[in-house]
Structure formats: C-alpha cells, structure tokens
Amino acid sequence: MSDALKKSIVDAIEEGQLKLGYREETIRLYYPLSSLCTLMHQSMDAAQMTRALTTFSEQVKGELGEIEVSRKGERFCLAVGPKGAAWVHEHTDPSGFLADFIAAIGRHGCTMDELLAIFRRHGGHVHVEALHNGEFDWLVYFEDGRPDAYYYCIADEGCRLTYHRFTKEDYEAFGFETT
C-alpha cells in the first residue's frame, strides 16, 4: 500500500472539510499520472496505474471505504465514498495547524504576518521565501516537515490572500521561479 497516497487523500478530504464543512458524501479527487507516480514511488503508464489504484483501494477499504477509480487519459479521478469522508472527519484534528491556517486565510483582511504567526506557532522551522513568478507572492513551508510537509504558495490578490498547497515534488515539477 502507498502510505503517501493514503495521506494525500486524507489530507485533501480534511482540507475540503475544513473549508466547506463535513458532509457524509462522495468526494472526488483528481490527480495527474505524474503526481500518482510520485506518491506511489514508481513510474507507471496509465493502464498500470489503474491496476495499482484498484489494488490500493482494496487495501484501504477498511478505513476509507469504497474508492472508485476512473481516468481520462492521464488524469485520474478517485471517488472516495461517504464512509471515507466519515472516517477522515473522525480521525483528523479540527484544531491543528491546517484548521488555524484555513480559518485565518478565509477571513477578509487576513495579513501575511498573521499567517506567518500561525506557521510559527505550530512549527519551529518555517521557511519563508518571496516569489516573483506571476502566480504567487510567497512560498512558506515547515523545513522539518512538521506538522506537515506541504509547500504553501500564497498570493496577495489585493483584497485577500489565497493559497495553493503542493507536495515538494509537485512544486518542483511546476518549475516556479524563486528569488
């Protein structure tokens, strides 16, 4: 079983539940083949990945319930059923870093200083880097991967801050320029 893929699925569902609230419903997550290969720690073509994901879904069925796998070309959809949504809701921390981060960035008038204070409150080694790539203004992440290993790309949209979070590997694959 791919622990990295399971973590990615759980983290994405948790993020959605923190933003939109919990509902016991099917959640569809979309992944490009390249990201799945990184998460599965091996190179595969689309047909091989489909088989690997079918095996993976059987392995995590006890926790995440049924996961329906479909694809169009090299774009995969993992449809996690209501049982999986409920399991994530019951097994994630509603008061951790991600909850604090999402609550702050979702508030009108949130500043970068507020976000950095949240990062520093939850972890001791915070990397902050100004970006000049036309997409994002800052890259922030926990250097030691605790409490999470995602790369947070934050943009100042003038009236509010927005973000996208990436695995280190996906961030590097995008080739964003840094200062």
Where are these regions (language model features)?
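Charge-enriched amphipathic alpha-helical scaffolds
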Residues: 27, 37-66
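Negatively charged, low-complexity tracts enriched in Asp/Glu with abundant Ser/Thr
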Residues: 97-129, 167, 175
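Long, charge-rich, low-complexity intrinsically disordered regions
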Residues: 88-99, 127, 134
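Short glycine-rich, basic-tinged beta-strand/loop micro-motifs
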Residues: 23-43, 98-104
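A cross-family detector of function-defining hotspots
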Residues: 117-151
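Charged low-complexity interaction tracts in eukaryotic proteins
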Residues: 58-94, 143
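Intrinsically disordered, low-complexity regulatory segments enriched in Ser/Thr/Pro
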Residues: 146-177
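Positively charged, polyanion-binding regions of nucleic-acid-associated proteins
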Residues: 1-29
